[in-house]
């Protein structure tokens, strides 16, 4: 079985896959809060506890981290606890199969690369990926699977938290759809601004991408959403076509399999 590890600023998501290629299947996933102070031993103890009896069935590990301190500990953990199985950490120098057509490829987050790979694999054409995480990323992928760049905006939760913490008369509210756009109390007003406002933000960015890039103006372009807040925003969006909850885990699986195939052929993995 393949263990996939997706470390972000807010959460760590683990996914357990059986099979490979078209026969692969995500059997189970787990979520935990990210603690940038966690050591390699603490990470391994937590992961092994979640995996339970599956821990001895792991035949490979693929991981990414957008948190530098955790990335270092992930590397140590893999060597110490899973050094006997093939493992891949997505970072510069690792082959992903995604050409990065940007000014500085090393600046592109591993999560954005992996999402782009999975989206193009699933929909086989030009696509726009919207990841609702700590930040809101809108990434543009060509029909050839090239990463063309994108947009980064604050995330839904971090925006509402900042609003509450920086405003004396406002407090943190539950992020749910309000009764209407026109709120009748402060809580509903904040919920309206968050839910409908972010739907408008995403729609605006997607439409601007379509206007700016002629090849993204047609009906063959797939707009795919992922991330914890995606199910809340999608019903209010006019541009998002698909929800792929496990997009990043699927991308990690693809990166692992591509690197294994490369090693099996005797060729050295390249970016």
Swiss-Prot record:
Question: What InterPro entries does the annotation carry?
Answer: ATPase_NBD, Type_III_PanK
Q: Which reaction does it catalyse?
A: (R)-pantothenate + ATP = (R)-4'-phosphopantothenate + ADP + H(+)
The principal location of this protein is cytoplasm
Pfam families attached here? Pan_kinase
The Enzyme Commission number assigned here is: 2.7.1.33
Chain residues that bind K(+) = 131
Catalytic residues identified in the record: 111 (proton acceptor)
The protein's UniProt keywords, in alphabetical order, are: ATP-binding, Coenzyme A biosynthesis, Cytoplasm, Kinase, Metal-binding, Nucleotide-binding, Potassium, Transferase
Q: Where in the cell is it found?
A: Cytoplasm
* Matching SUPFAM superfamilies: Actin-like ATPase domain
Which coenzymes or cofactors are required? NH4(+); K(+)
Gene Ontology cellular-component terms for this entry are: cytoplasm
One GO term in the molecular function aspect is:
pantothenate kinase activity
Q: How is the cofactor bound?
A: A monovalent cation. Ammonium or potassium.
Q: Which GO terms describe its biological process?
A: coenzyme A biosynthetic process
Entry's NCBIfam families? baf, PRK13318.1-3, PRK13321.1
Cross-referenced HAMAP family, in alphabetical order? Pantothen_kinase_3
The family annotation for this protein states:
Belongs to the type III pantothenate kinase family.
- PANTHER family per record: TYPE III PANTOTHENATE KINASE
Q: What name does this protein carry?
A: Type III pantothenate kinase
Q: Which gene encodes it?
A: coaX
């Amino acid at each position: 079985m393949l263990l996939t590890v997706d470390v972000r600023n807010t959460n760590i998501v683990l996914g357990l896959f059986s099979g490979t290629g078209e026969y692969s299947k995500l059997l189970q996933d787990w979520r935990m809060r990210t603690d940038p102070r966690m050591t390699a031993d603490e990470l391994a103890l937590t992961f092994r506890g979640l995996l339970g009896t599956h821990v001895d069935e792991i035949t490979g590990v693929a991981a990414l981290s957008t948190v530098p301190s955790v990335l270092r500990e992930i590397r140590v953990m893999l060597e110490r606890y899973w050094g006997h199985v093939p493992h891949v950490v997505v970072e510069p120098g690792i082959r992903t199969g995604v050409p990065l057509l940007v000014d500085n490829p090393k600046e592109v987050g591993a999560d954005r690369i992996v999402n782009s790979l999975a989206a193009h694999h699933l929909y086989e054409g030009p696509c726009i990926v919207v990841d609702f995480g700590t930040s809101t990323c809108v990434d543009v992928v060509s029909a050839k699977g090239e990463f063309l760049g994108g947009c980064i905006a604050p995330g839904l939760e971090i925006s509402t938290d900042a609003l509450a913490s920086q405003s004396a008369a406002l407090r943190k509210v539950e992020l749910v759809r309000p009764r209407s756009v026109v709120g009748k109390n402060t809580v509903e007003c904040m919920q309206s601004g968050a839910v409908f406002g972010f739907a408008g933000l995403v729609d605006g960015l997607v439409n601007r991408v379509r206007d700016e890039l002629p090849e993204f103006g047609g009906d063959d372009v797939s707009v795919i959403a992922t991330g914890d807040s995606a199910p809340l925003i999608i019903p209010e969006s006019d541009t998002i076509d698909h929800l792929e909850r496990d997009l990043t885990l699927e991308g990690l699986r693809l990166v692992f399999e591509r690197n294994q195939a490369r090693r099996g052929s005797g060729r050295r993995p390249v970016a």
